Amino acid sequence: CSRKNKINCFACVWSIEDLKTLASVSNEIVKIPSPEAYNLELIKEALKTFKKVVISVGCLNQKELKKLFKYKKKNKLIILHCVSAYPLKPEDCNFKKFHYLKKIFKNVGYSGHMNGIEDAIYALANKAVMIEKHFTTNRNLQGRDNKFSLNEKDMFKITDLREKFYNFNIDRGLGIQKKEKDIFKNYRGRW
């Protein structure tokens, strides 16, 4: 399921020690969570060690965010627009910041804490390279996250939409497509 739908599982690291422990298991992808996104030492080490580095920028002030600009050309870096509030209200999603980040960084995604999938759909429609949502098998379980986490059905909806949005953006040129030739040939100028 996760390979077929291109769903990657990864872990957050909160320290250099965590980073080294995770790297001993896999050096594919690591996430620096919002509260640690100011930690340039951790970011530098992650960029040296991992193939992909995801940084959630929810808790950064403007000055701290600008310090990340020096990494803007790194292909292995994915910046996640995030608002660190649980659960997040639609009016607090602040997608203006998402669009601002897209002007600066090559790879911008979205980490959503809103109930439902509408925020993820918006991010996908605006070409987010990655969507991160919390996942649960049961929304009635204890804990803050389970109340706004996605279930399996929601996750499949997002992966299906991601595929459709990708297909919407395939460049087919400006001329007549093969699929249109029958209509063009048989109906044009008919009336």
Residue ranges and their predicted role:
Residues 1-191:
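Catalytic cores and adjacent flexible loops of soluble metabolic enzymes
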